[in-house]
């Protein structure tokens, strides 16, 4: 089954990625992906796009040939206080805000520090999805993080790329996160973390985790465009109302 939503992609605006928006649209049409988010790295990363890149995402069309393009960012968690590298009114102009740990911005430390930073990010109200929380370089108190995510309505990502090209050793942590999410009622989302368009909508390894723990598919944000749009609306992103006329008649 091809899930029709991908919340985590990178373009050539992040110089270690290799595809354009046009490339992603072409692959989306081929694979049946109906809605994807462009989420290049936040400006604190050395090769990330300039701040203005995110401000000017407003020039992107909402829909192209039946495919929706969400304007987003994968921000960097900067410190123990859970601060990220994108701020103020500019956040309200984005459709979706992801954030996670990245070594060039937040050096790996200890479990207590990582847990506090992640929970403070969740509590901040600025971030919709925590990316690759199962990264073994950043051990966390899984139960505490998942409890906070459930309480504050923030989704946790099962990152497909973590099992294929980066963050080796993530499988055990991601399985534990998925089990805890099922038990505690937290929302999960699969992210391709695509750095080349061919990977768009690629969730095979992440889905194997979801299936292994029998996580309820009706809580998985990838299940339909409206599932994600309803989630983002509840998170306060009024901008996503632009998409609803295009998808509201589809099953959630």
UniProtKB/Swiss-Prot annotation:
Pfam families named among the record's database cross-references: PHP
Keywords in alphabetical order: Hydrolase, Metal-binding, Zinc
Record text on cofactor binding: Binds 3 Zn(2+) ions per subunit.
Residues that, per the record, bind Zn(2+) 3: 74, 102, 132
Entry binding sites for Zn(2+) 2: 16, 41, 195
Binding positions for Zn(2+) 1 per the UniProt entry: 8, 10, 74, 193
Recorded GO MF terms: phosphatase activity; phosphoric ester hydrolase activity; zinc ion binding
GO biological process terms, semicolon-separated: bacterial-type flagellum-dependent swarming motility
Cofactor: Zn(2+)
Keyword Oxidoreductase attributed: no
Any Gene Ontology CC annotation: cytosol
Enzyme Commission code(s) on record: 3.1.3.-
Matches recorded under NCBIfam families: PRK09248.1 (NF006702)
Family, per entry: Belongs to the PHP family.
Protein name: Probable phosphatase SO_1652
Species annotation: Shewanella oneidensis (strain ATCC 700550 / JCM 31522 / CIP 106686 / LMG 19005 / NCIMB 14063 / MR-1)
Top-level taxonomy: Bacteria, Pseudomonadati, Pseudomonadota, Gammaproteobacteria, Alteromonadales
């Amino acid at each position: 089954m091809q899930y029709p939503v991908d919340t985590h992609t990178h373009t050539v605006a992040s110089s270690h990625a290799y595809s354009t928006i046009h490339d992603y649209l072409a692959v989306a049409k081929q694979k049946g992906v109906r809605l994807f988010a462009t989420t290049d790295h936040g400006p604190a990363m050395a090769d990330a796009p300039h701040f203005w890149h995110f401000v000017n995402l407003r020039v992107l069309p909402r829909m192209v040939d039946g495919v929706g393009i969400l304007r987003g960012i994968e921000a960097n968690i900067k410190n123990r206080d859970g601060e990220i590298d994108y701020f103020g009114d500019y956040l309200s102009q984005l459709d979706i805000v992801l954030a996670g740990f990245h070594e060039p911005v937040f050096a790996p430390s200890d479990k207590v520090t990582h847990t506090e930073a992640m929970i403070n990010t969740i509590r901040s109200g600025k971030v919709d999805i925590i990316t690759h929380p199962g990264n073994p370089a950043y051990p966390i108190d899984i139960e505490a993080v998942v409890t906070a995510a459930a309480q504050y309505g923030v989704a946790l990502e099962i990152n497909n790329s973590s099992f294929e090209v980066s963050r080796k050793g993530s499988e055990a942590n991601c399985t534990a996160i998925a089990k805890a999410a099922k038990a505690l009622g937290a929302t999960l989302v699969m992210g391709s973390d695509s750095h080349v368009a061919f990977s768009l909508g690629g969730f095979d390894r992440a889905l194997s985790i979801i299936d292994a723990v029998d996580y309820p598919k009706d809580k998985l944000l990838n299940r339909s465009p409206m599932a994600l749009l309803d989630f983002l609306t509840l998170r306060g992103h009024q901008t996503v109302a632009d998409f609803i006329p295009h998808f509201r008649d589809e099953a959630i």
